[in-house]
């Protein structure tokens, strides 16, 4: 079968999912004719993606999260205003996607959570089906329950997510753990789509690659570089704790060495994974993909959401486990409930270290769930 991918270029997660999906399809005799990637002035397409993806990559202007003045969290007001004011500028992108789909004539379109991809698909009047893929679709599931307060932004998020899924033949919702499907909403719950380089670090027989160890340092990733101030302030008081953080500062050197125990790295996927495998604990802005990588390797997690979508991820990775297990005071009938992560509004590394040493309970079923991905995804792309 012949596929075209449409990929949201914001952050790292959707890009690595596209890499994994292309590899899976090619290994099973399918063709990926093109990868259409949404770009924005604030982000540069990571070199690891351009280097790894085999299909031709074509770019189009797409929606963008606009950070606050401190470049820490996404500003809902600024993001909304920016994208509304630039809406006319997105019309050429919709036309571009529509035209390319007509030219390429794929058997299947895979949309990695890009709203302009959905609109371009609809305007193309293509008869081929569109599959939507992303963890955000799990928030539409009938069994996904939000808390009664503090998450009002999920209404706008779910409205947007419903728009992305408009006209999809099937919706594949990436999840930390198995859940029943939601046929009414065309939602199939599927494992995270991790790359072979990640899966090979923890084998099916339970043994680990020698690279997986506790190297004593804290590893981290911040989508918005403004969080680096949190890290610098903590480091000034705890200079004995090694820190290795990745950020999106393309204007800095590939590795910015602050001193012997603190370095900032521009995003490089091979180096990122190497540092993940060897860390004591991991701190992140709660993006789905790297959280799954840490959970797969059994690393304690600090999740620092920078916008409502990541806040929902953090909720799912913490309280979601308690709800699923019907736990009371953190205990279920046949043992401890997994507690892979803790959340904070800042990069509170004291909290992470305390959690790692005293409260962390790995989700030991997660690696098995993640290893099911290839067979599940091949099945879902065959039976449309």
Stretch-by-stretch model annotation:
Residues 49-52, 95-108, 118-131:
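Glycosyltransferases and closely related glycan-assembly transferases
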Residues 9, 27-28, 32-86:
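Conserved nucleotide-sugar phosphate-binding/catalytic loop shared by glycosyltransferases and other
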Residues 195, 202-278:
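Donor-nucleotide binding loops and adjacent catalytic segments primarily
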Residues 163-170, 177, 321-384:
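Leloir-type glycosyltransferase catalytic cores
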Residues 129-189:
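Active-site-proximal region of nucleotide-activated glycan assembly enzymes
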Residues 109-112, 274-313:
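A donor-sugar binding/catalytic signature common to diverse glycosyltransferases
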Residues 72-108, 115-116:
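Conserved nucleotide-sugar donor-binding subdomain of glycosyltransferases
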Residues 7-19:
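A short, glycine/small-residue-rich beta-strand->loop->alpha-helix junction that serves as a flexible
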């Amino acid at each position: 079968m012949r596929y075209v991918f449409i990929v949201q270029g914001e952050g790292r997660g959707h890009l690595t999912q596209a890499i994994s999906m292309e590899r899976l399809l090619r290994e099973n005799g399918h063709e990926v004719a093109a990868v259409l990637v949404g770009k924005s002035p604030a982000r540069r397409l990571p070199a690891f993606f351009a280097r790894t993806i085999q299909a031709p990559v074509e770019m189009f202007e797409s929606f963008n999260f606009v950070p606050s003045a401190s470049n820490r969290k996404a500003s809902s007001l600024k993001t909304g205003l920016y994208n509304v004011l630039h809406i006319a500028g997105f019309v050429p992108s919709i036309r571009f996607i529509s035209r390319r789909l007509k030219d390429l004539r794929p058997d299947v379109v895979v949309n990695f959570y890009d709203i302009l991809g959905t609109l371009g698909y609809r305007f193309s009047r293509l008869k081929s089906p569109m599959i939507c893929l992303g963890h955000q679709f799990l928030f539409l599931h009938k069994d996904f329950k939000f808390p009664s307060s503090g998450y009002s932004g999920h209404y706008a998020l779910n409205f947007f997510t419903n728009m992305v899924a408009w006209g999809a033949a099937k919706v594949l919702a990436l999840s930390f753990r198995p859940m029943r499907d939601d046929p009414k909403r065309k939602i199939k719950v599927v494992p995270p789509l991790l790359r072979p380089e990640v899966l090979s670090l923890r084998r099916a027989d339970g043994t680990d690659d020698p690279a997986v160890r506790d190297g004593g340092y804290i590893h981290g990733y911040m989508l918005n570089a403004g969080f680096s101030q949190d890290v610098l302030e903590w480091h000034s008081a705890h200079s004995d704790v090694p820190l290795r953080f990745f950020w999106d500062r393309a204007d800095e050197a590939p590795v910015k060495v602050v001193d012997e125990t603190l370095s900032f790295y521009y995003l490089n996927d091979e180096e990122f994974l190497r540092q993940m495998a060897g860390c004591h604990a991991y701190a992140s802005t709660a993006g789905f993909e790297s959280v799954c990588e840490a959970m797969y390797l059994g690393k304690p997690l600090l999740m620092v959401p920078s916008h409502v979508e990541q806040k929902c991820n953090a909720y799912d990775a913490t309280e979601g486990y308690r709800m699923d297990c019907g736990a009371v005071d953190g205990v279920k009938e046949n043992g401890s409930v997994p507690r892979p992560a803790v959340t904070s509004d800042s990069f509170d590394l004291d909290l992470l270290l305390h959690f790692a040493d005293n409260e962390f309970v790995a989700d030991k079923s997660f690696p098995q769930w993640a290893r099911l991905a290839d067979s599940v995804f091949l099945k879902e792309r065959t039976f449309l």
